[in-house]
């Protein structure tokens, strides 16, 4: 799973699978789900993310994590 933040559009993309979406559905105002060809969730796109959430912190609970840092 990867989190991508795009400040130019203030959108947060939560990627569950590294495959392209075949279909998108807006499931709520400003929340789009991407589905693969089998209808499985690939990721979520959240518009106006910084206005909806505090993006300055990220907390995980009981997840087996492998951390990487962006260059």
Predicted regions and their residues:
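Hydrophobic beta-strand positions
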Residues: 4-5, 34
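C-terminal structural segments of small proteins and small subunits
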Residues: 43-71
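N-terminal intrinsically disordered, cationic/polar leader segments
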Residues: 7, 11-20, 63-65, 69
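Amphipathic, hydrophobic secondary-structure cores in small proteins
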Residues: 11-50
């Amino acid at each position: 799973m990867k989190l991508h933040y795009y400040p130019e559009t203030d959108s947060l993309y939560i990627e569950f699978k590294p495959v392209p979406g075949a279909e998108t559905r807006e499931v709520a105002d400003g929340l789009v789900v991407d589905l693969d060809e089998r209808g499985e969730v690939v990721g979520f796109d959240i518009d106006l993310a910084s206005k909806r959430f505090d993006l300055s912190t990220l907390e995980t609970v009981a997840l087996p994590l492998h951390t990487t840092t962006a260059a």
